[in-house]
Amino acid sequence: MNEDLFTPFTTPTVLGLPAAILVILFPPLLVPTSKHFINNRLITTQQWLIRLTLKQMMITHNTKGRTWSLMLTSLIIFIASTNLLGLFPYSFTPTTQLSMNLAMAIPLWASTVAMGLRFKAKISLAHLLPQGTPTPLIPMLIIIETISLFIQPLALAVRLTANITAGHLLMHLIGSATLTMLTINLPLTLITLTILTLLTILEIAVALIQAYVFTLLVSLYLHDNS
């Protein structure tokens, strides 16, 4: 089908409604509230998952590190919600953009490093030189450790971008193959449709796991500097 110059700017619709409205209305469903004294199963399960995740990340932190609990909880919920919303048709996943992931990773990483330099500067600087290093290797190891320190936010952002983008590309390719095979070979279409369904389930798991991994690594950086 031929497209004009303004096709990329056309607002996508679902059942006659702008997709943006549906995307905006979806996040409140992830944080339901109950008017009853006793919460229902959905809210109870959600609160249990948040407490479990927070416990896993905060169990090794001291008092200063635990002040980040609200920040880390908000971060994992934001990334998980963004990844899951990107799996909907006619939607866009911001976490596939390296610029956005860098915008999240660099300030968080810089905050942990600044916290370490403020409260325990000697220990933080000591990480640049492993104990027992031979004297001739000291300059080289300091340079290597410094480079590895500055690569941490880049690794955070690239890991999230690559995993989310790869999954979306696979879903797009298999989905296109399913539509192509629909008029050619019905049994093969059923096979590709089954693969697409399994891949979608896998991508839901990847969306949640990548949110947890990103937040957990930030938590580990915080633990090293608090």
Curated annotation (Swiss-Prot):
UniProt xrefs under InterPro entries: ATP_synth_F0_asu, ATP_synth_F0_asu_AS, ATP_synth_F0_asu_bact/mt, F0_ATP_A_sf
GO biological process, one term: proton motive force-driven ATP synthesis
Catalysed reactions, as listed in the record: H(+)(in) = H(+)(out)
Membrane topology per record: Multi-pass membrane protein
An example Gene Ontology CC term for this record: mitochondrial inner membrane
Cited SUPFAM superfamilies: F1F0 ATP synthase subunit A
A Pfam family matched in the record: ATP-synt_A
Keywords per UniProt: ATP synthesis, CF(0), Hydrogen ion transport, Ion transport, Membrane, Mitochondrion, Mitochondrion inner membrane, Transmembrane, Transmembrane helix, Transport
MF terms in GO: proton channel activity; proton-transporting ATP synthase activity, rotational mechanism
Keyword Membrane in record: yes
TM annotation in the entry: 12-32, 68-88, 97-117, 138-158, 164-184, 189-209
Keyword Membrane attributed: yes
Subcellular location(s) per record: Mitochondrion inner membrane
Similarity remark: Belongs to the ATPase A chain family.
Subunit structure: Component of the ATP synthase complex composed at least of ATP5F1A/subunit alpha, ATP5F1B/subunit beta, ATP5MC1/subunit c (homooctomer), MT-ATP6/subunit a, MT-ATP8/subunit 8, ATP5ME/subunit e, ATP5MF/subunit f, ATP5MG/subunit g, ATP5MK/subunit k, ATP5MJ/subunit j, ATP5F1C/subunit gamma, ATP5F1D/subunit delta, ATP5F1E/subunit epsilon, ATP5PF/subunit F6, ATP5PB/subunit b, ATP5PD/subunit d, ATP5PO/subunit OSCP.
Physiological role: Subunit a, of the mitochondrial membrane ATP synthase complex (F(1)F(0) ATP synthase or Complex V) that produces ATP from ADP in the presence of a proton gradient across the membrane which is generated by electron transport complexes of the respiratory chain. ATP synthase complex consist of a soluble F(1) head domain - the catalytic core - and a membrane F(1) domain - the membrane proton channel. These two domains are linked by a central stalk rotating inside the F(1) region and a stationary peripheral stalk.
Name this polypeptide is given: ATP synthase F(0) complex subunit a
Taxonomy of the source species: Eukaryota, Metazoa, Chordata, Craniata, Vertebrata
